[in-house]
């Protein structure tokens, strides 16, 4: 081994052992000073006794002697030290170690990789241990009451941006464990994860190279098969936490899915709504392909000036030209005519959501790229190669991913 690396590891081990001993001494002193009283009634515990407690911490294993006693009011045995430190019965990991391991679990591609990474920074744990703690905490996360941060005394004016999107998660199907004799087994089931990104427009900056960057953003993601009304409630609740009621303007950007626009009318009716430009572009290209054939120079020549008009504040003209396609007599196959009518109707329904030049002048986004980026980040953890989730396993880990992204994770150990 490299001499410098070996020396550094040795010194780190010495410092780690010093930290472990210091932590052990302070914890033992705290435990000794705690009164052996019932946490509910305040009465002395009955039949008290001393027991060993081994606690795994970031610094290593600390070994303590702690009191136990019976609390008649609770009808159970109580350890005052565990109560004071927020440890559940039989919990072996300290809150700080559990928080670090859980964060690692949400960031890397699997529980096995998380275990290997934890071992590299000196806190070895099995992938089964990480899985058990993630599932327990993910279940607890569903019961959290997330507080609304207090606004600063002199808060400057701001606008809020909300982007809605979704992506597909791979779960175990009804025939996941079926034997080889099962005909046409449905081993995999795909379900949508509805997600959203919320940020203040003033937090949108650019790097020196011109790349967009969000200084601060917040995420919403709900488990598979969450009803749109419940997803809308979750988005509205998070938006309120982030200043929805105080925002000067609320920008809402999303694709053309009907359920998204129904949700917007229900929960965010006063928001300035925009159809994601890239989806509008794709539908305009679909019209060009219907008229001139896919991949032809004529299709490109037809669509380019209309895209320029769409971005240049002439969206009403674009919609009118599309409507004229249906007014002019033309001989088309019935299937092509039906498809063309569907695409034109798409733009008619969104004629008030195509003001891209206005959005650009306000510095607001024209597309929902941040929401798509969130989906890709979550997929890196939740849709890796070979991953097929049970519903509880996916739901609990998804909740933890969102908590850590929003920096609400300390509430799990509060």
Give the residues covered by each predicted segment:
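Short cysteine/histidine-rich metal-coordination sites, predominantly Zn2+-binding motifs
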Residues: 52-61, 87-95
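Short metal-coordination and nucleic-acid-contact micro-motifs, chiefly zinc-binding Cys/His arrays
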Residues: 30-36, 42, 51, 64-67
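Short Cys/His-rich metal-coordination motifs, predominantly Zn2+-binding knuckles/fingers
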Residues: 38-43, 58-60, 73-76
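Short Cys/His-rich "knuckle" micro-motifs
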Residues: 46-51, 82-83
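Catalytic center-proximal scaffold of phosphoryl-transfer enzymes
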Residues: 1-28, 66-414
